[in-house]
């Protein structure tokens, strides 16, 4: 099972409070483990413009402003830009299922600061990581629902509504979603 490009939707029974009502886009998944970015938990006290200022990256008057999210509990000082596939930095951009790109170099920050770069993007500080078999076990334990990731929802500005919106997109009423599940 390769979940690359899939969206993990935290179940109401999620035991880890860091992932409560989280949506995680899986960027890489292999027998060695998985890596993903939470796409609906904005960092409240840091704007993209503020981050550019901290990094001494000049922002043009037409510079883009993207949302900064907490991508997960791992390496929170490291930044990743999840973006539409219309931007590629040779040797630095990882394509995720053809619908997304992920770039973790200063080039994309500079492009966005100049008003260039991908048509859609969000910044993530840190990432979510799983060791070999760990994510599969969490899915089997019903910690997560999995679904194809709609790019319009991933890049939506409605961070508080993304979790509910994704469930509705799947035809699930969040009010009737049980916090326990069984196996047939």
Curated annotation (Swiss-Prot):
It holds the Pfam family DUF179. SUPFAM superfamilies: VC0467-like. This is UPF0301 protein RHOS4_26140. Belongs to the UPF0301 (AlgH) family. PANTHER family: UNCHARACTERIZED PROTEIN YQGE, UPF0301 PROTEIN YQGE. Transmembrane segments: none annotated. NCBIfam families: PRK00228.1-4. GO terms for cellular component: cytosol.
């Amino acid at each position: 099972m390769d979940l690359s490009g899939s969206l993990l939707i935290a179940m109401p029974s999620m035991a880890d409070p860091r992932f409560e009502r989280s949506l995680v886009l899986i960027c890489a998944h292999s027998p060695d483990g998985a890596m993903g970015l939470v796409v609906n938990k904005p960092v409240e006290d840091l704007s993209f413009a503020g981050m550019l200022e901290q990094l001494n990256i000049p922002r043009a008057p037409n510079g883009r402003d993207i949302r900064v999210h907490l991508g997960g509990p791992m390496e929170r000082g490291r930044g990743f830009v999840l973006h539409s596939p219309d931007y590629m930095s040779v040797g630095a951009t990882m394509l995720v299922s053809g619908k997304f790109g992920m770039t973790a170099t200063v080039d994309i920050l500079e492009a966005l600061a100049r008003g260039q770069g991908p048509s859609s993007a969000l910044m993530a500080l840190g990432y979510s990581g799983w060791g070999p078999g760990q994510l599969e076990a969490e899915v089997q334990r019903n910690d997560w629902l999995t679904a194809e990731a709609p790019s319009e929802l991933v890049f939506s500005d409605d961070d508080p509504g993304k979790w509910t919106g994704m469930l509705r997109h799947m035809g699930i009423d969040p009010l009737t979603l049980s916090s326990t599940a069984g196996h047939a």
